[in-house]
Structures are given as structure tokens and as C-alpha cells.
A protein has these predicted regions:
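Intracellular alpha-helical coupling/juxtamembrane segments of multi-pass membrane proteins
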Residues: 47-71, 75-101
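ABC ATP-binding cassette signature C-motif
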Residues: 1-56, 107, 111-360
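Short hydrophobic/aromatic segments of transmembrane alpha-helices and their interfaces
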Residues: 25, 101-102
């Protein structure tokens, strides 16, 4: 798409894709379409700048109007000051009013999701851990410490979800070992939870997990994950995939685990949902292990990166940026080799042609 010579219109929740491909963003919000030159990251920065400037100008203008209005009120009844009052009134009337900017979509999860207790410093250790079903898909060795956030990337079918299922005890390891440290309490999100079905309401479904809560306590917990008002009486089967993810996360985080294991938590979320979850996980004081295809999300949240590649795994202890540097370096080296081969091949062809000419 970057090399396509004609226009491209793309609708996407993939922010990395938008960063890499587009050179202008149109945002449709509050019934208005606004144009922002540049990619997605540039759009976010410009939107914030525009919001801040408009709010600053709006506040300044309102203060000036109030100041002028006080003068008008003070002097409009005094004959010697009537002209001054009229002048200030006209100044107010001539102003082009700067409206307050539309609010950001500032919906955020506001639960107390921080761990109830700390783990020891050593959280997860794996040594030559072979994961898979009939045969090994990958082998994983790592040593994860308290508070670290491990993002996991890789192609389909290489064992990312299988690794998570193995360490939470859903399936057995084929060989090798893994162990968790002391005081570990795991909260596990399976991507299939986004497909969860139930004929119950959101409130009743949540109550099944926490029957000892009062209605007020249950509704407060759900409200923290954006289920407010009549939303709690929606049938679970009528929820979107993103709403089901929020319900699942609410159930999980209500236990306040100190280790979160999440398998593709953003798959069904829109950009606002992803950015809200990003903010929550960045603030999370426990240890995080998560699989995601969303590179933008991984880059924002992960402090370390584990990449699954054709039966092997590589750990990047400095996160996504270190991995990207490696990809850029390999791409540059490959390009140089290609250029070298092209030049070398051209030289041989020219020599061959010269020799052939002389022979003739």
C-alpha cells in the first residue's frame, strides 16, 4: 500500500498499520469529520495540542468577557461612564466566541485492580520448556521477575497461546520445567472468553462469580468496567466481543491477582478500548504476561518481549524497540546484499559480453 501510486482509503483499529501506511487521518467524532495530516501517532499528538490550545483560548476569552461585563455592569447607570460601558458592551458583541472543545472519549476502567499482596521477586522460571500437543511447537527458557511486563509476539500456530495454557496448568508440558515463585495469584484471560455465551444478564452473570456481594457492590464493580445504568441488565449474549472482554476482565481483576496472564485481550476492542486497557496495564503494579498481535499495544505496554519464530523463541529484554532495531538491521543488511549481488552480477554480464564480442 505504501508503494501503491493511487489513493487509498483505509478503516482500521490497527494503529501500527495506520502509522506505517497513511499520511492523513480523518477522525469522525461528535458528528464532525476533522482532517489531521500525518500518521496515527501524529494525529494523536496534534489532537491533544488542538484540544489544549482551544481550551486555553476558551478560558482566556471567558475571563475577558467576565472582566468586560463587570465594567459594563458597574458603569452603565452612570451618565459620565455610559460611553465606556457601551464601548465594552460592543467589544463583547464583536467577539467571535471560542467554544469549549468537545471532550475526549474519556471512558476509563476505574477499578482498584492493584494486587492485594505482592509476589516474591522471582515470579516465573522456565528451563527448556517444550510446549505443544502431539509434538513440540516451541521451547521456552526465561526468568521473569516481579513487576515485569512480558509481551509475546509471533506468527499463528507457533505456540504462543499454548505457552500460556501450559504455565497456567490447562495443558501439560511435553518436557522441561517451569515454576512460579512464592505468593503468586494468577488471573488468566483466555481469548475464547470474548465468545462467551450466557442467557443471563450482565449483573446476574457477575453475581454467579461473586454471590456474596450486595447489588450495590456488584454494580459498582461492573461500573468500574463501563457497565453503568441499564447496561447491567443487558443479556450477555447480546454483548459485543469488546463488552464480553470487559466483563471477563472485571471478573478476573475483582480477585486482585498479582500475576496477569492475558491471551489476545485487545482482539475485539476498538481503539478507545485498547488505549484504556493500555493505560490500566501500564499502571498495574503486578507482573504481566500477555500475547498480542497488536504491535502498537505491545510497544506501549511490554517491558520485555518474547518472540516465537519457527520453533525457537528469542527474548528481548529491552522490549519492542530492541526487537525493531534487530528487524531494521536485518532489513538493511539484506538490502545491501541484494545491491551487492546486483552490482556483481552486472559486472559479470558486462565482462561476458565483452569477451563474447572479442571472440566474434
Amino acid at each position: 500500500l505504501k508503494s501503491y501510486p493511487k489513493a487509498v482509503v483505509a478503516v482500521s483499529h490497527d494503529r501500527m498499520f495506520l502509522d506505517n501506511v497513511v499520511d492523513v487521518v480523518y477522525e469522525i467524532e461528535y458528528g464532525t469529520a476533522r482532517r489531521y495530516p500525518g500518521n496515527y501517532t501524529n494525529f494523536i499528538a496534534r489532537k491533544k495540542e488542538n484540544y489544549d490550545k482551544q481550551m486555553k483560548d476558551h478560558i482566556a476569552q471567558q475571563k475577558e468577557i467576565e472582566r468586560l461585563q463587570r465594567i459594563v455592569t458597574r458603569f452603565k447607570g452612570k451618565p459620565t461612564k455610559t460611553s465606556m460601558a457601551q464601548s465594552k458592551q460592543k467589544a463583547i458583541e464583536r467577539m467571535v466566541i471560542i467554544e469549549a472543545p468537545d471532550k475526549y472519549d474519556n471512558k476509563t476502567f476505574h477499578a482498584n485492580f492493584q494486587p492485594e499482596k505482592e509476589t516474591g521477586n522471582d515470579v516465573l522460571y522456565t528451563s527448556e520448556l517444550a510446549i505443544g500437543y502431539d509434538h513440540p511447537l516451541s521451547v521456552v527458557s526465561l526468568d521473569l521477575k516481579r513487576g515485569e511486563k512480558l509481551g509475546i509476539l509471533g506468527g499463528n500456530g507457533l505456540g504462543k497461546s499454548t505457552f500460556l495454557k501450559t504455565i497456567v496448568g490447562k495443558i501439560p508440558a511435553l518436557s522441561g520445567e517451569y515454576r512460579f515463585g512464592t505468593n503468586v495469584q494468577i488471573g488468566y484471560f483466555d481469548q475464547q472468553m470474548a465468545m462467551y455465551t450466557s442467557n443471563k444478564t450482565v449483573l446476574d452473570d457477575f453475581w454467579d462469580e461473586y454471590p456474596n456481594l450486595t447489588e450495590t457492590e456488584a454494580r459498582n464493580a461492573l461500573g468500574a468496567f463501563l457497565f453503568s445504568g441499564e447496561d447491567v441488565f443487558k443479556n450477555v449474549n447480546m454483548l459485543s466481543g469488546g463488552e464480553k472482554v470487559r466483563l471477563a476482565l472485571c471478573k478476573i481483576l475483582k480477585t486482585r491477582p498479582n500475576v496477569l496472564v492475558l491471551d489476545e485481550p485487545t482482539n475485539h476492542m476498538d481503539i478507545v478500548g485498547k488505549e484504556t486497557l493500555e493505560s490500566m496495564l501500564k499502571d498495574y503494579k503486578g507482573t504481566l504476561i500477555f500475547v498480542s498481535h497488536d504491535r502498537y499495544f505491545v510497544k506501549k505496554v511490554a517491558t520485555q518481549l518474547l518472540v516465537f519464530e519457527d520453533g525457537t523463541t528469542n527474548l528481548y529484554q529491552f522490549g519492542y524497540e530492541q526487537y525493531q532495531e534487530k528487524l531494521d538491521r536485518e532489513a538493511s543488511e539484506s538490502k545491501n546484499v541484494y545491491r551487492g549481488n546486483a552490482i556483481f552480477g552486472g559486472a559479470i554480464s558486462q565482462n561476458g559480453g565483452s569477451q563474447k564480442g572479442r571472440g566474434e
